[in-house]
Swiss-Prot record:
Family: Belongs to the peptidase M24B family.
GO molecular function: manganese ion binding; metalloaminopeptidase activity
Catalytic activity entry: Release of any N-terminal amino acid, including proline, that is linked to proline, even from a dipeptide or tripeptide
UniProt-recorded name of the protein: Probable Xaa-Pro aminopeptidase SMAC_04549
Highest taxon listed in the record's lineage: Eukaryota
GO biological process, one term: proteolysis
SMART domains assigned to the protein according to its UniProt record, in alphabetical order: AMP_N (SM01011)
Function text: Catalyzes the removal of a penultimate prolyl residue from the N-termini of peptides.
InterPro entries assigned: Aminopep_P_N (IPR007865), Creatin/AminoP/Spt16_N (IPR029149), Creatinase/aminopeptidase-like (IPR036005), Pept_M24 (IPR000994), X-Pro_dipept-like (IPR052433)
Organism: Sordaria macrospora (strain ATCC MYA-333 / DSM 997 / K(L3346) / K-hell)
Residues binding Mn(2+) 2, per UniProt: D263, D274, E437
Residues involved in Mn(2+) 1 binding: D274, E397, E437
UniProt remark on cofactor binding: Binds 2 manganese ions per subunit.
EC identifiers of the protein: 3.4.11.9
Taxonomy of the source species: Eukaryota, Fungi, Dikarya, Ascomycota, Pezizomycotina
Length: 467
């Protein structure tokens, strides 16, 4: 069962990001893997870095591992969690009087303690002394757990017998898969802002000339609603460009083209949304475009209906291919026995990517265990392999594409060409590509759909026509 009622995320977001609970979950994972583990977790936030040959800072993006245990978006911070004492300490940069005139006063220790879910706040000048003090009081065999290549040269772990650089990253990546109520509330807010942004683009699509104007509409909407950062570079692909999965130029004129594929999602508090809609530029799908759209919509609806806790994602991806084959047979692009087509993997020519991926602080979030060396082309680019736990968030983004570069080798290979009607296919190149993508929370009995952007074909046509 899929629920689409809007979440009351604002009430939840009045509280603090549950960083302490995240630290406890990570520590539990480590203790399960390393029985009797004692010591501290140590993490560093992203450091300020200047642009090459320039005195201006690079755009800042907080390290996700650090954010997961702190909720702190500041640069140049450090963090320590004492596993045995269940105590978290955030270290923030001290006040630099010379920078105040340029940047204003930074967050104070008292403000940081009030803002974020940590037990203690100190300044970064105290990191080594604090580590040394805590380490000296630990029993023999205590460890400091850290992430390779994310420890500054100035940091020392001299008082700890063991330095473990192998398990902390894994522990955080696995723990991040299952979201808590607060994380889901953040993602619901990111989705609502981005969903409304997609609708805003639909309302403008027939009034502009170039893809970049629509990118500006989406970005402007997100920024106006407080979502300044994008989860990824927007894909604004008109006409045949929609057959390029990660098209990023976003600068082509749209005159004479049929459809627009918009894959765009803003962030809220370091958490991503990832939404795709495909709609007619002039407000009315052509016969061929609507046929393909209906196939993809059925792929998505049926796959969402199959989801619940414990479902094998591989099976849902396979279901999407079966529905694609049935639909392409019905409109005549494919021909022959559907089981033979499935076995031959000919449908990969039209649906070459995985059905979806985990979503969280990263667009392609952690914990999916993909196998990009899989010899089976149908599953090679599936970013999640295994069963879905309740509380995970996954994208469901089936698509059908008409990319000459991908399809041409299939047409030249007798193993596949016998299943493709090239004459019928010729009518569909200008459709470009159709993808529909929503963000789903897995529950015990089904899913909760975070995405509210319109996707009913008649509704989208009406929005565009009445704009």
């Amino acid at each position: 069962m899929t629920t689409t009622t809007r979440m009351d995320y604002e009430t939840t977001l009045k509280g603090k990001y549950p960083a302490k609970r995240h630290a406890q979950r990570v520590a539990d994972y480590i203790r399960n893997k390393v029985p009797g583990a004692s010591g501290v977790l140590y993490l560093e936030g992203r450091a300020t870095k200047l642009l090459e040959d320039n005195d201006e800072a690079e755009p800042f993006r907080q390290r996700r591992y650090f954010y997961y245990l702190t909720g702190c978006p500041l640069a140049d911070c450090h963090y320590m969690y004492d596993i045995d004492a269940d105590k978290s300490t955030l270290f923030i940069p001290p006040i630099d009087p010379e920078s105040v005139i340029w940047s204003g006063l930074p967050v104070s220790a008292d403000e940081a303690k009030q803002n974020w879910d940590v037990d203690e706040v100190k300044y970064t000048s105290d990191v080594n002394a604090t580590l040394a003090h805590v380490g000296s009081e630990k029993p023999k065999g205590a460890s400091v757990f850290a992430i390779p290549n994310q420890v500054s040269d100035k940091i020392t772990f001299l008082e700890f017998d063991n330095k473990n650089f192998s398990i902390l990253k894994e522990a955080i990546e696995v723990t991040r898969v299952v979201k808590d109520e607060y994380e889901l509330a953040i993602m619901a807010k990111a989705n609502e802002i981005s969903s409304d942004g997609h609708k805003a683009v639909m309302q403008k699509v027939k009034h502009v000339q170039n893809e970049r104007e629509l990118e500006a509409v989406f970005l402007g909407h997100c920024i106006a609603k407080g979502s300044r950062n994008q989860a990824y570079h927007s894909i604004v692909a008109s006409g045949r460009a929609a057959a390029t999965l990660h098209y990023v130029p976003n600068n082509a004129d749209m005159a004479g083209k049929l459809n627009l594929l918009l894959d765009a999602g803003g962030e809220w508090d370091c958490y991503a949304s990832d939404i795709t809609r495909t709609f007619p530029i002039n407000g009315k799908f052509t016969k061929e475009s609507r046929e393909v759209y209906d196939i993809v919509l059925k792929m998505q609806n049926d796959c969402i209906a199959a989801l619940k806790e414990g479902v094998l994602w591989d099976d849902v991806h396979l279901l999407a291919h079966k529905i694609a084959i049935d639909g392409l047979l019905q409109i005549g692009i494919l021909q022959g026995d559907k089981d033979e087509i499935l076995e031959s993997r000919t449908s990969v020519a039209f649906f070459p990517h995985g059905l979806g991926h985990y979503l969280g602080m990263d667009t392609h979030d952690t914990g999916g265990n993909p196998n990009y060396a899989d010899k089976d082309t149908m599953f090679r680019y599936l970013r999640v392999r295994g069963r879905l736990p309740a509380g995970s968030v996954i994208t469901v983004e089936p698509g059908i594409y008409f990319c000459n570069f991908i399809i041409e080798p299939f047409l030249k290979d007798p193993k596949h060409s016998k299943y493709i009607n090239a004459d019928v296919l010729e009518k569909y190149w200008d459709v470009g590509g159709v993808r529909i993508e929503d963000n789903l929370v897995i529950t015990k009995d089904g899913t909760y759909n975070l995405t509210t952007a319109p996707k009913d074909p008649e509704e989208m046509e009406k929005i565009i026509q009445q704009s």
